[in-house]
């Protein structure tokens, strides 16, 4: 069976109050990040913590019932510690996708087909919208671009980050040394490291 909760982050984005208003989003707790050690997450990602709880670096589990329960919590991302300072509602309707997390036994073929279509729709939202992004300050976004100069793709304030020796997407991170390169088609010259 599939899962309709967020299981990872898909990129970084810098949001401003005007962009939030323009997109019909809203800040439901806290504020937008201003410092380099601050992040905001979407209400869609928040739902994962509401379901599973939050576990701190020292192993202490906290129940998350309200948006503000997550504000002030720390997350370690790429060996850096960030404080969650805000939650942004990116308008993902969790109820629409609930059925894909339910047991498929006893479902009709039509129900399974509908669940499959919904899972593909949700996968697209997770990958290509702001629903699974980490919201950072403009300065932090620029810092990330400097840290990964080999490959940074910006599309409407959405950033994909990669480098010559690391492949990153929302479901896999691997060093080139971990990949069997005989099955790789190099589009811009073979990479050895």
Labelled PLM ranges:
Residues 1-193:
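Basic-flanked hydrophobic alpha-helices used for secretion and membrane insertion
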